[in-house]
């Protein structure tokens, strides 16, 4: 079937708007009971943490980064790199873990968790970083929970 770009965009929007199995839906009051005030401000109100203030900016230990709101694994430490931007940076997410919403003509996208729709940060493209994707997923530390792959013996 031959479709116009407008029809393709509408079909994508319809697909994204469909409720997903396992999606977590809570009221703001319910979110406030499980998130700290700072987590709520970022995940639910789409705010941003102060540059360089996040606990995961300089962490390069092996493990998995999960959405702090719902525990959904969103990034592997193997995709993390030091971009010098002041927030944790990744070049790719775990497949199916994030949604992207275009904000700046294909150069910047808001990223949210596919399971709870929590705001994680932004993806910026074509900045010239020597990564496999030429993308920088600039993520708020407060939106993440790190699980180390290193176990105590």
Curated annotation (Swiss-Prot):
Catalysed reactions listed for this entry: L-methionyl-[protein] + [thioredoxin]-disulfide + H2O = L-methionyl-(R)-S-oxide-[protein] + [thioredoxin]-dithiol
Domain MsrB: 28-149
Active-site residues, as the UniProt record annotates them: 138 (nucleophile)
First-level EC class: oxidoreductase
Single GO term (MF): peptide-methionine (R)-S-oxide reductase activity
Gene Ontology CC, one term: cytosol
Keywords: Cytoplasm, Disulfide bond, Electron transport, Metal-binding, Oxidoreductase, Redox-active center, Transport, Zinc
Residues noted as binding Zn(2+) in the record, renumbered to the chain: 67, 70, 113, 116
Necessary cofactors: Zn(2+)
Cofactor, how bound (note): Binds 1 zinc ion per subunit.
Subcellular localization(s) per the UniProt record: Cytoplasm, Cytosol
Main location: cytoplasm
Disulfide bond residue pairs: 85-138
GO biological process: protein repair; response to oxidative stress
Keyword Nuclease: no
One Pfam family hit: SelR
UniProt-listed Enzyme Commission number(s): 1.8.4.12
Functional description taken from the UniProt entry: Catalyzes the reduction of methionine sulfoxide (MetSO) to methionine in proteins. Plays a protective role against oxidative stress by restoring activity to proteins that have been inactivated by methionine oxidation. MSRB family specifically reduces the MetSO R-enantiomer.
Family statement: Belongs to the MsrB Met sulfoxide reductase family.
PANTHER family named among the record's database cross-references: PEPTIDE METHIONINE SULFOXIDE REDUCTASE 2
Name of this protein: Peptide methionine sulfoxide reductase B6
